[in-house]
Regions:
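Short, well-formed alpha-helical segments that are part of the catalytic scaffolds
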Residues: 18-31
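Short beta-strand/loop segment that forms part of the nucleotide-sugar
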Residues: 36-45, 68-70
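A conserved acidic beta->alpha catalytic loop
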Residues: 43-52, 100
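Glycine-rich, basic loop-to-helix element that forms the pyrophosphate-binding segment
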Residues: 70-87
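Short aromatic/hydrophobic "clamp" motif used to bind/position activated sugar donors
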Residues: 92
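Conserved donor NDP-sugar-binding/catalytic core segment of glycosyltransferases
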Residues: 105-138
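Conserved nucleotide-sugar donor-binding catalytic segment
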Residues: 125, 145-225
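Catalytic core of nucleotide-sugar-dependent glycosyltransferases
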Residues: 208-216, 220-249
Length: 301
């Protein structure tokens, strides 16, 4: 379906048995003055909790949401791709139910940037990792380092996901790749790589932030943690055999191993220094009130 010229952005929300996550997204957005966006919610849940939440929210907000109950369920990746196939906006943003906008004017800020820079194909947003039990947060990756990494070879994303979750990746709808259903661990980064190989015409919007909830025991990441090593091994073999990548991040020659070891040390030092910096200067003080506002509806529901 061709993008509707009147719609600038499609916010795509796949959900599965987690109405609280959808609640956090919807009640964290100010949609009163947003006229250039559509919101699509595609639901794989076997129960009607999400549908009830949508009905209640639309009565209060007067904002129309396109809601689809998948019968039968499509599975996570099938649901994501179905949302992308249904998007009508010029740009699309896929926001999972454990991700959320930090500020209520998130959509209007993003639309303003898209209108100001209409020639861009990709907008990268900043990502904040949020730990709801403690109320603390840390940057996914410091902005300066992220800016530098965005200039590196796209295949480095297979080594380190410096973009973050799909909610931090806004892409022109007609160019947005589809997620590879044969992947689990590398499914996000593989899509980013495919898009960056098509176009490096991107802009990093460090002032527009999304939160990523950490520590959920029923997340996809948690469900595969016990077999992660085997999954990564199989997927690397698949990527080598089907995508044709052959660089230092996949090879097993001595030089590649040395480079990966040095990179591992650098990355570890960067992670430690980021945490120390966050503690010393209280990085959370900037978005802390906004993050509390974002997670507060969950605590009160």
């Amino acid at each position: 379906m061709k993008p509707n010229t009147e719609l600038l952005l499609s916010l795509l929300i796949p959900v599965f048995n987690y109405p609280e996550g959808l609640f956090r997204i919807l009640y964290g957005l100010n949609l009163k003055n947003v006229k250039q966006c559509e919101v699509l919610v595609f639901d794989d849940s076997p129960y009607n909790g999400v549908e009830k939440l949508i009905d209640e929210w639309q009565l209060k907000s007067k904002f129309n949401i396109t809601y689809v109950r998948n019968i039968p369920a499509l599975g996570p990746i099938g649901n994501w791709n179905n949302l992308l196939d249904s998007a009508k906006g010029k740009f699309s943003l896929l926001m999972h139910h454990d991700e959320f906008p930090i500020e209520p004017d998130f959509l209007s800020q993003l639309c303003a940037k898209i209108e100001t820079f209409p020639d861009k194909d990709i907008f990268i947003l900043d990502c904040i990792l949020v730990y709801p039990e403690s109320g603390k947060s840390t940057p996914h990756i410091p902005s300066l380092i992220k800016s530098l990494l965005l200039r590196s070879r796209p295949t480095y994303l297979y080594r380190r996901n410096y973009i973050g979750p799909s909610a931090a990746f806004v892409c022109r709808t007609k160019s947005y790749p589809r997620f590879d259903e044969r992947l689990m661990w590398f499914v996000d980064v593989d899509l980013y790589v495919q898009m960056f190989l098509k176009s490096r015409n991107y802009m990093y919007l460090s002032n527009i932030k999304v939160g990523s909830l950490q520590g959920r025991k029923d997340s996809i990441t948690a469900s595969i943690s016990s077999s992660l090593k085997d999954i990564k091994g199989r997927e690397i073999s698949y990527l080598l055999n089907t995508k044709g990548f052959n660089d230092m991040w996949f090879n097993n020659d001595l030089a590649s191993k040395i480079i990966r070891s040095l990179e591992f040390v650098f990355w570890g030092l960067m992670r430690v220094s980021t945490k120390i910096f966050s503690l010393l200067v209280n990085h959370s003080s900037i978005p802390r009130a906004l993050i509390f506002r974002a997670i507060k509806p969950i605590n009160n529901k």
